[in-house]
A protein has these predicted regions:
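Alpha-helical transmembrane segments of multi-pass membrane proteins predominantly involved
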Residues: 1-483
Length: 483
């Protein structure tokens, strides 16, 4: 084996180094001792990992072309690493509990293992490597969902996640087998050269799309989402809702545009249907929720629909707008989950929306930060979420212009998405109304979040404001996508 190939996998190599150092630090230190240094160590290692890989590099390959990584994939990996860093920072408050402190090392290693699997997914140029990366991400993620194993809800959520992940992997592997039967190869480049629209390849594409649809929580593959999000530890829910979803969405976009380009009219129709169903059904269900984590679950399903809008463009603008949307979604969504987690830790695990009535009077700063994040998720200017939605709409309209037979349909999908944006503003404002206007006889008491949570919220808030104002962020992504 030529080990020099690992030099072409710098993001994965540095991440494996972070994982190895974390394992050694956990193994060599006493779990009964006070390990306040452990979380800062892991976070500093992640900062170093991001700093090494933040600038796009030239296209590289390894393992006979099964692994390929270009500037666009490198930028997406940096975005995923940033989201992971924020999760690790805000997890410190939750991991300080007696029932989780002794598992702190396991949590970090599971999170880093899922990120490594996602990186392999993003850089895969072969269906086998893609599937291995997907399973590398899914198995540790199932452990994370069931991390609070002594809580009934967490164990139940883990079981549901495992069953759903197993089923979706089976569906996807069946689709891959059909594609192999039709094309005789599993390399993305070679499949793209020989694939034609036939009943066998269309079936393979649909099964493959369905398998990834489960990972992204697209309707009608979303049934596991609300229960798993509700039962998982809140920090894990935040990680699952942004980092995992972002990696799967980017990979689906890249494969559709690269491998299934000769069948563009077939998967475009499939996308239209899934986008409309995801945005509309998720919005209608979100309005009815009383549990804040279930509310955010349906919000994430709706956001997945908006992310998929970018794919309609079928161009480098699609990659650019999708990556930018994922970046903004990471900071906005993790900001909300950081506040929910902090409230849980200080107020007996409450996640009911009614509990936030009068939240502004007792915790004005957290209420203000929650409002900023919700406004960004809703696409209210001048926050970054407005620009991210604008760019995915622009990509979708670009797709409508280039499709000769399906252009009118694309405009219809964009119109439906715009209408649903107004609906989403309504249910995001329900939380704002509860915090600022509604009265409660027993409001949440005033409390101080941990320093780690404050740091995570500071990073997210700066991102929500600055990423929309500073054009160089979008330019950085655009240059990488067009390289």
């Amino acid at each position: 084996m030529n080990y020099s190939q690992f030099l072409n996998m710098i993001p994965e190599a540095t991440l494996m180094a972070v994982l190895l150092i974390t394992f050694i630090a956990d193994f060599c230190s006493s779990k009964s001792a006070d390990r306040k240094w452990f979380n800062p160590l892991v976070c500093l290692l992640m900062v170093a990992h991001i700093a090494i890989n933040i600038f796009p590099t030239e296209a590289t390959s390894a393992f006979g072309g099964m692994y390929t990584s270009g500037p666009a994939a490198g930028v997406l990996k940096t975005v995923l690493a940033l989201g992971t860093l924020i999760v690790l920072i805000q997890a410190k408050e939750w991991l300080s509990r007696k029932d989780t402190a002794f598992k702190e090392g396991e949590f970090y290693m599971l999170v880093l293992s899922t990120l490594l699997g996602m990186n392999m997914m993003v850089s895969a140029n072969h269906f086998l490597l893609f599937f291995l990366g997907l399973e590398m991400a899914s198995v540790p993620m199932a452990c994370l969902v069931a991390f609070d194993k002594y809580r009934h809800n967490s164990a139940e959520a883990g079981a549901k996640f495992i069953l759903t992940a197993t089923f979706s992997s089976g569906v996807m592997s069946y689709g891959i087998s059909l594609l192999y039967a039709a094309c005789g190869t599993l390399y993305f480049d070679d499949v793209a050269k020989v694939i034609t629209a036939s009943p066998l390849t269309i079936a393979g594409m649909v099964f493959f799309f369905s398998g990834l649809g489960f990972k992204i929580s697209l309707v009608p593959f979303h049934f596991w989402t609300a229960d798993s999000y509700q039962g998982a530890p809140t920090t894990v829910t935040g990680y699952l809702s942004v980092v995992s979803k972002g990696a799967a969405a980017f990979t689906l976009c890249a494969i559709l545009m690269k491998v299934f380009q000769p069948m563009v009219e077939y998967w475009t129709v499939l996308l239209y249907i899934v986008i409309v169903l995801s945005i509309t059904i998720a919005n209608l269900f979100a309005i009815r929720q009383s549990d804040l984590k279930r509310f955010m679950a349906f919000s994430s399903i709706s956001q997945a629909g908006y992310i998929m809008l970018a794919v309609i463009g079928n161009s480098t603008l699609s990659i650019t707008s999708l990556t930018y949307y994922v970046l903004i979604y990471v900071v906005a969504n993790l900001s909300v989950f950081a506040i929910i987690s902090s409230v849980e830790e200080h107020n007996g695990g409450t996640v009911q929306m009614d509990s936030y009535n009068g939240f502004y009077k007792t915790n004005p700063r957290l209420a203000f930060l929650m409002t900023l994040a919700l406004f960004s998720l809703g696409g209210i200017p001048p926050f970054a979420g407005m620009f991210s939605k604008f760019f995915v709409f622009m990509a979708a309209v670009h797709g409508a212009d280039i499709h000769t037979t399906l252009g009118a349909w694309a405009y219809g999908v964009v119109f439906i998405a715009l209408v649903n944006t107004v609906i989403s503003l309504y249910y995001y404002l329900l939380i704002v109304k509860a915090m600022f206007i509604k009265h409660s006889d027993s409001p949440l008491p005033t409390f101080q979040s941990a320093c780690s949570t404050k740091l995570a919220l500071a990073i997210c808030t700066v991102g929500i404001v600055a990423f929309g104002i500073c054009s160089f962020v979008f330019d950085w992504i655009s240059v990488a996508a067009n390289a």
